[in-house]
Amino acid sequence: MAGDEPLPGDGQRRRYLIGYALAPKKQQSFIQPSLVSRAAGRGMDLVPVDPSRPLPEQGPFHLLIHKLYGEEWRGQLDAFSAAHPAVPVVDPPHAIDRLHNRISMLQVVSELDVPLHAHHHHTFGIPSQVVVYDAAALSDSGLLAALRFPLIAKPLVADGTAKSHKMSLVYHREGLRKLRPPLVLQEFVNHGGVIFKVYVVGAHVTCVKRRSLPDVSSDVLQDASAEGSLSFSQVSNLPNERTAQEYYDDMRLEDAIMPPTAFINDIAAALRRALGLHLFNFDMIRDARAGDRYLVIDINYFPGYAKMPGYETVLTDFFWEMVHKDDDTPNLNPNPNDEDVK
């Protein structure tokens, strides 16, 4: 097996193997030459994992990162962790599971314990939302009584598939007829067409701003002849290009004020503790009705980090921290002549 061969640099300095198990598309976007080079310069070699082969036949790994799903893969990870308890697996499948359901995903935000007094008048929460399990419930006025149009309809399951990204912006009740449960109906809150994407990598936090769906005017909501709903795939994708372009001609993304850094960091740290995850991002908007209130609208596991500025350095630092997490990290290199130089 691979572990029986000397690792690069044997006899000079210890090298660490970082195994990654990713879908082909994810691997193509995340494992960039710049990341591989940066990690190698720190003594860490990124090695692809073949999920069709038993993990004990591969490696030996000092850290395992992954974004694969299924019972067979989960069984592989459980067996690996039982055999190598000192080797970090980022992240545990049971912790990731919570993000696959859009209700449990945001419920954790409501349960966070963040000392808001330290941030003066800034507050955060989630939009009002309900889960709909069958089509009959869409005509239940009682179920929808707590919500105000417009609404965003999202699939209940958020598993990274194309289907889970298909969403609709619903302007009035007529638009509900096209929806296919199970799904989550979430109030669309005007937010100036700007979304804040907060990337979390261990203790590191980076916040960037992106264009989002344009605000919905009261005229649109009152226009009975207008389309009842519009479909789109991501919050940053525009359902109506002409209207959106007119909207963005009147606003500049660079003028949008970023949330306070300490405020963002505290929310990120609280989410990291509550979720038990190292790699995730969350999307946040500023409520246009109250400029000091922010709403978390989505949380994603192992997002597209290549879009994050300086991601190579951030991820390399994270890998280094994880392989040195325990001072007693075992030397998994079977070569007895290997020197443990850190």
UniProtKB/Swiss-Prot annotation:
1D-myo-inositol 1,3,4-trisphosphate binds at residues 25, 67, 165, 197, 300. It is an enzyme of class 2 (transferase). Mg(2+) 1 binds at residues 283, 298. ATP binds at residues 102, 154, 186-197, 212. Binds 2 magnesium ions per subunit. GO terms for biological process: inositol trisphosphate metabolic process. Belongs to the ITPK1 family. This is Inositol-tetrakisphosphate 1-kinase 5. It comes from Oryza sativa subsp. japonica (Rice).
